[in-house]
Amino acid sequence: MKQPLVFNQLQFSIEQSQLIDQPLYMNNKTTEFSINRDGDILDYCRLHDITIQAWSPLQHGFFKGTFVDNPDFPELNKALGEVAEREGVSKTAIAIAWILRHPAQMQAIAGTMNPDHLRDICDASKVKLSHHDWYQLYLAAGKYLP
């Protein structure tokens, strides 16, 4: 191939965070998060200047819908709501801002034609989450830190 690969679309969200889970869980064989399922694609892309585009950034699972305002994710939605209120944006904007805050400089793919939803997603660019907020949201999604 003569044209270099400049982006890669991968499923990634605060709820579908396998791209970053494995290194954090690698010494814990009691959880499925310790299994390397992606061949270190995040590190590969960063080393080769390939931009990761997060597709389905608000989805959980493949066909289960969004995690935002979903009663199956009460802790995550509570945390998203607290940060959203403080920042003056929606929970959707905070969920996207969480992706944008990652040092890999990811892009989020907005798979919607709804103008209100697009505005919420664009509002994420107004928010720069602190490291503390980023990790608190990660923990609220049911993950843990070493």
Where are these predicted regions, by residue range?
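Beta/alpha (TIM)-barrel catalytic core signal, keyed to glycine-rich beta->alpha loops juxtaposed to Asp/Glu
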Residues: 1-146
